[in-house]
A protein has these predicted regions:
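Alpha/beta-hydrolase fold nucleophile elbow
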Residues: 154-164
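Alpha/beta-hydrolase active-site loop
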Residues: 133-152
Length: 404
């Protein structure tokens, strides 16, 4: 989602002492020397993007349990990209595994950035492994510690950001540590209040136009009606791409993929409903559209297992969404709309929405210096922040915008 005009203008107002002119960089060796003096981090120089002068892959040693700082540790991967120590710092709090890339905000502000991988994802998996330390608060403590560490070097303004689950993480961090940064820009940060948040259902029933919603529904119905033609294609696709569906079950996974379509279409689609196939379309056209917009690869074993940390968080604190099955009851044989198959087999999560409700209330009524950005078609906007006008925070919704 690209907000190219308003965000720069707002930041110029919020940070009127910023200087965006290029300055002669004399701090390269100074930064590396400083990094080498910090205990409990590992530093490797990497090639920077062209807007930066230096970049590093860094592993920060973190307590697995911040309530027991002398206990077992793990290494959390971050990427630091440098321009000037006096310029702003954008810190992206990612919700998943992370690869180094340049954020929209650091390009706009021509400033430094840190990309933070989320605990239990990618290269940042604790050992010994214990699900109970994968919590919102523990991750916020990770982020707080990283910010404290690098504030010793970077004296400019700090801006936190994140996309999708990372946007939620920026909100979570702000709730626990509001003084850590000067401003926050969460992109598409949902705050679910239930394991099957009903706001998602209502969103899908009201987004776009009645004609477009009808085309989405009719396509789902078409996929069920053409099950005998499409299901063998899914099996062939699975064989070619070495996908298995043993966790959910092959036929049940097909049904959930069709149910997921209405969510996935609005999440990632461009809103051009004229491109949705209908009963006059060929089986190949239906399949290609389904593959591009549905959940065919969302329910395979590898995808589920790689997302186990996310799903564990959904079933403990984050919340999630389920699927409405009543309108397809004449077609469904296996799916009941719930997703317990997403829960890691070696875990026993208990869902507790109390923290999310507190954070949602805080974000709506008390959060200062936030710019909440959402997409107008994205179902994840439905559990987004609803501001009450009590603070200086603003919410921006891109018309017809997706999750991207």
């Amino acid at each position: 989602m690209k907000i190219k005009l308003l965000v720069p203008a707002i930041f110029l107002l919020m940070f009127s002492n910023f200087s965006f002119s290029q300055v002669e960089d004399t701090l390269n060796s100074d930064l590396y020397s400083w990094l080498k003096t910090i205990p409990d981090i590992e530093v490797t120089a990497i090639k920077p993007d062209k807007i930066f002068t230096e970049a590093y892959e860094i592993f920060v040693t973190q307590p697995i349990d911040h309530n027991n700082p002398d206990g077992p540790k793990f290494k959390e991967q971050i990427f630091l990209s440098h321009v000037d120590k006096d310029k702003p710092m954008v810190i992206e709090l990612d919700g998943y595994a992370v690869n180094n890339r340049t954020t929209e905000l650091s390009r706009i502000l021509e400033c430094n950035q840190i990309m933070v991988e989320h605990r239990y994802f990618g290269e940042s998996v604790p050992s010994p492994f214990d699900w109970k330390y994968l919590t919102i608060k523990q991750a916020a403590d990770d982020h707080h510690r990283i910010i404290e560490l690098f504030k010793d070097y970077y004296s400019g303004k700090w801006i936190s950001t994140g996309i999708s689950k990372g946007g939620s993480c920026a909100i979570f961090h702000g709730y626990f540590y509001p003084a850590d940064v000067n401003a926050s820009v969460p992109y598409v940060g949902p705050l679910n209040l239930s394991i099957d948040d009903q706001r998602v259902y209502e969103w899908i029933k009201s987004v776009s136009t009645p004609e477009c919603r009808e085309k989405v529904f009719n396509f789902q119905k078409l996929c069920f009606e053409k099950r005998d033609e499409l299901y063998p294609i899914i099996l062939k696709n699975a064989e070619e791409k070495k996908l298995t569906y043993n966790i959910v079950g092959y036929e049940k996974a097909y049904e959930y993929s069709v149910l997921e379509y209405s969510f996935a279409y609005w999440q990632w689609g461009n809103g051009d409903c004229s491109l949705i196939p209908d009963e006059n379309s060929s089986t190949e056209e239906i399949w290609e559209h389904f593959l591009a917009n549905g959940g065919v690869t969302y329910f395979d074993d590898e995808s589920i297992e790689s997302n186990y940390p996310f799903f564990y968080q959904c079933y403990t604190e984050f919340g999630y969404y389920a699927y409405e099955v009543d309108k397809f009851k004449d077609y469904i044989r296996y799916a009941d709309g719930q997703t317990p198959f997403f829960i890691p087999k070696d875990s026993n999560p208990t869902y507790d929405p109390r923290l999310l409700k507190k954070i949602n209330n805080w974000a709506s009524n008390e959060a200062e210096n936030f710019i909440f950005i959402y997409g107008g078609n994205d179902p994840w906007t439905s559990p987004g922040v609803c501001l009450t006008g009590k603070t200086n925070s603003i919410k921006m919704v891109l018309p017809n915008g997706s999750h991207a």
